[in-house]
Amino acid sequence: MANFSESKSMMAVFFMFFLLLLSSSSSSSSSSPILKKIFIESPSYAPNAFTFDSTDKGFYTSVQDGRVIKYEGPNSGFTDFAYASPFWNKAFCENSTDPEKRPLCGRTYDISYDYKNSQMYIVDGHYHLCVVGKEGGYATQLATSVQGVPFKWLYAVTVDQRTGIVYFTDVSSIHDDSPEGVEEIMNTSDRTGRLMKYDPSTKETTLLLKELHVPGGAEISADGSFVVVAEFLSNRIVKYWLEGPKKGSAEFLVTIPNPGNIKRNSDGHFWVSSSEELDGGQHGRVVSRGIKFDGFGNILQVIPLPPPYEGEHFEQIQEHDGLLYIGSLFHSSVGILVYDDHDNKGNSYVSS
């Protein structure tokens, strides 16, 4: 387990200077135009996270009422796939946006597909770390605490496709995802977040990092040598080493304004949602960007989000087959951006 000091404020100044350079650059490698916006209406509110199975026929997303749903094309639309809560029922939970119902219905914040074993890992704010098979249904709960400290608000999850080991974050060890909990996290600048791993072969959960500053994202590298973790309130990404001479240690990687969830693309690079808070924090102005960076901390691309995501917090930006999937807590549709000249024939299930 590792701890580390905060980065220098000059890194934030450098980042903002770098953004100005990107915005004025004509290089397509740093700033690609949005060619098309696609919106797929969800049967429930706030589709915020995505994953894809090995068939590559559609996608999965988690929604506000506690479900994980699957989209299989414009003809089939969405179908229910999984529930983290064993108590989820249609009459009480379906399409609910009431936070008071989350303890019963659940609220999934991230999902990650294990291709080798054809199963999906789920992190839920109330039912914690779960797994469900390829047929879906009610998920099996795997872990609820680490070192005797219960999880309060699991938020990000990723699977090492080589080993099957699961890495996930807890936003806070004290406060949950209730409106009151969120307010306390922000007001106290909570630093009790954690990074954990779960080994399905031993069924053991291990604490890797603690005292994180609202860790809203985590993703493993393509070679499995490190995990990158986003600290929302520290405006930074840190790298935790899993292999090599630095194994078990963490280090500052790159400054990102208010980073959210992180997802790796097929090139081994990382996309992170950035909802930069201006004018006094969460009730002020927000600058919404998708930012791509590499494992060395180099910023490769910055994409200002178009309406309706412009100027608001968003949860996730994930690249798949040349499309960018946008996860948000404030809309009832899945936003998909075509941002370059990739051939998207493999994604014919997406209706345009």
Swiss-Prot record:
Pathway: Alkaloid biosynthesis; 3alpha(S)-strictosidine biosynthesis; 3alpha(S)-strictosidine from secologanin and tryptamine: step 1/1. Keywords: Alkaloid metabolism, Glycoprotein, Hydrolase, Signal, Vacuole. Residues 1-31 form the signal peptide. It catalyses: 3alpha(S)-strictosidine + H2O = secologanin + tryptamine. Monomer. Catalyzes the stereospecific condensation of tryptamine with secologanin to form strictosidine, the key intermediate of indole alkaloid biosynthesis. This is Strictosidine synthase. The lineage of its organism: Eukaryota, Viridiplantae, Streptophyta, Embryophyta, Tracheophyta. The gene is STR1.
